[in-house]
Structures are given as C-alpha cells and as structure tokens.
Amino acid sequence: MREIIHVSAGQCGNQIGAAFWETISGEHGINPSAIYEGTDPLQLERLSVYYNEAGNGKYVPRAVLVDLEPGVMDAVRSGTYGNLFRPDNFIFGQSGAGNNWAKGHYTEGAELVDSVLDIVRREAENSDSLQGFQISHSLGGGTGSGMGTLLISKIREEYPDRMMATFSVVPSPKVSDTIVEPYNATLSVHQLIENADETFCIDNEALYDICQHTLKLKQPTHADLNQLVSGVMSGITTCLRFPGQLNSDLRKLAVNLVPFPRLHFFMVGYAPLSAPGQQSFRSLTVPELTQQLFDSKNMMAASDPKRGRYLTVAAFFRGKVSIKEVEDQMRSVQERNSAYFVEWIPNNVQTAICSVPPKDVKMSATFIANSTSIQELFKRVGDQFSAMFRRKAFLHWYTNEGMDITEFAEAESNMNDLVSEYQQYQNATVDDEDMEYEDELPLEDEM
C-alpha cells in the first residue's frame, strides 16, 4: 500500500496533528485503544496508508511526534487518543526553542534531529511502498519552523524521490504569540520553496476571522482553531485514505496542482462551516456547498482569490452526492467567473467524490486552490519582516546561535521572488511570447 508518514513538529504542529489523528480515527472506525470498530468496508480498504497494523490487531498511526519541550507531548499522550501512538515515536528535548528559528534549526533542534530520523527510518522500513511524508508545523515559533524545516531538508536528502507535503500554519499579528514571527516565517518559507512538493497554507488570521464571523465565537481558543484545521486536513487527505479515482496519492495531487515547481503553496477551504452544536438541521445542497467553497470567507488563507487568478483547483465532495450535479455546478462556477481562472491551463479544475461523509454532517466539500492571490499572505509577512530587518531588530537572538545575517537577506529575497513569480503568471495570457520560461524543462525531460 502507498504509505504516508506523518511528522508533527513543535507545539502547534503537535496540537493540529493530534486533532487530525482524532478526526481521521473517528472516520475510519478506530477507537482510542487503536481497535477497529467500524461497520463500513470502505473504512478499512486503504487504512494502511496512515496506519500500521500491529500484531495484536491494533492499528497504530504512522506518526512521529517531535518537540523541543515536553509539555504538549504530555498533553497529547494523556489526551483521549494518546494511547493510539507508538510510545517510542514521541521524541522531545527539555530546553525549548524559545520562539527562535535558529535554535530549532541550528542548535537545540540539530542535536535532536538524528534520533528523529532514526524513528522516521524505522517507520519507512515498516512500509511496503512509501509514497511520502506529511509534516504539520507552524512557521511562527521556533521548533515547528526551525526544526520542522531542518527535518524536511534531512528527510528530503535521505528520500529524494518521495513526496513531501506540509501543513504549514502561517502567523498573523491577530493571533500572535511572539514579536519575531515574521523572521521565523520568512526563514521557513525560504526552506519550503526549495524542499517541499506541496504546502497547504493555513493562515491563523483567516482561522481567527472564520471563528469570529462565521462561527460567531467571541474569543476563539486554540482548540477552536485546531478543530477547523483538522476538518480541512481530513478533507484534503480524503482522496488518499478512501478509494477513489482522482488525486489518489500525493504525487497525483501535485501533478494536477503544481504547474511550476516553486509555485506549490495552496489555499484551502472547507464547507459547511457551522459552529459547534449549531449543525443545521437542513442538509446543504451541492450548489450551496460549491458556492461556499469559492467564497473567500471560507478560505483558510487571509487572501481574497478575487484579487488574483486560479492556476489550478481541486475540489473534494464527500457524502451521498451526484457526480453529475457536482460536475455541472463546478463547470457553472468556472463559466460565471472565467476571468478568475488562467486560460492557458485548460481543464484546471478537478473534482473528486468520496461516499464516506465526515462525522456529524451528511455532506461536505474541501477546496484546494493554487491561486496567485496567495502572494498577499507572503507580502504581509514580508512587510513585517523588512520593517524589523531594516533596523536589525532582535537579530542578536539569531546571530548568538551562530546564524549569519546573509541568511536573512537570502530568505527575504527568495520570498520576494516567489511573490513576483505569482504576479508574473497572474498577468500572463495565452498569447504571451515570454510564456516559454528558460528554467522550465520540457515535460518529457522531467518525467
């Protein structure tokens, strides 16, 4: 089976990772003791993508949990689903990274990285045909960003032909823990551009807005934000976990969504969004779901897709839905909004359907878009970065760990280049003479 190994790094990464495992265990009928008690054979058919069947009939997540301090690990371990995980797969330091990317990447994290790679290696050896890795982490702190990107580059070095997907939480001043978040995020994006194949950008600002405006939560907690994220992660991975034709593995997903290797940062959306305990008594129709999906209020990135253009889109519908109705709806959205889709990638919207709905709703839909408007998110972080970097504020925390200032300048310029590339493709038309880019190989050379 095409296995995926999940790595959670840092506080945020472990919190959304734990919420993800709890959600998908529920969908696959795995109880907190790791025993299958489901009723639908579809739950078992591709279970081995994410779970390893242990000798005692238990299904153990292919998960590695990493942090530079023990607090969150203890919380995960003592949580409802804490016994699901293999105890050896919790790896933690004691000192923490103090929200400092350099500590995670070069000092504290570097000391722990070999023991993490040993566990990753063991999980890879337990796989018949490993398709790749998925990392959950945040870009604003020290461990998830610094050590998370260190792990990504080390895993990439050792498994260069496997897919690398990341669920990356982008910081926002609205939900800020620390003043140096723009530094940590920019240094991380610099790494993700080079070492990840697909990055699902989860933007704290957008999560916060959804909680306040759509879910009507006055003071959203981290648990509320994590609940949203786990729903989206469950939706994105539906095609990987249940039988289906389209985007059934990480590589096929990337082939459909990534037109140029550096442009692999996706906006994600989810519908229906309803407050806990407010599940509506009326099921949404396919047209309503589709409309919600394309609404910027349902996007987990605080960028408005109407300010850019879609390069590619994948939508996943779950539940008892008619394939024809879904395809008609998606086509009609495209026809009504053709200005927002680049015309030089024909058939750039793809739809998949899975008959297993998520728990508690009859139908749901998840949306993954490679939209040029994601540049707004990078610009937001970049502006905050340059405001501090121009004054060399807080840099001593990084240089004291042995970092060189040139690395900051390189990261800033790589992220600025990414923004310009998105802009360039946003403006491109079918007839552009300069659409032949020297650095893109012809397809047959790449395969």
Swiss-Prot record:
It comes from the Eukaryota. CDD domains: beta_tubulin (cd02187). GTP binds at Q11, E69, S138, G142, T143, G144, N204, N226. Keywords: Cytoplasm, Cytoskeleton, GTP-binding, Magnesium, Metal-binding, Microtubule, Nucleotide-binding. GO terms for biological process: microtubule-based process. Its cofactor is Mg(2+). GO terms for cellular component: cytoplasm; microtubule. GO terms for molecular function: GTP binding; GTPase activity; metal ion binding; structural constituent of cytoskeleton. It is found in: Cytoplasm, Cytoskeleton. Dimer of alpha and beta chains. A typical microtubule is a hollow water-filled tube with an outer diameter of 25 nm and an inner diameter of 15 nM. Alpha-beta heterodimers associate head-to-tail to form protofilaments running lengthwise along the microtubule wall with the beta-tubulin subunit facing the microtubule plus end conferring a structural polarity. Microtubules usually have 13 protofilaments but different protofilament numbers can be found in some organisms and specialized cells. This is Tubulin beta-1 chain.
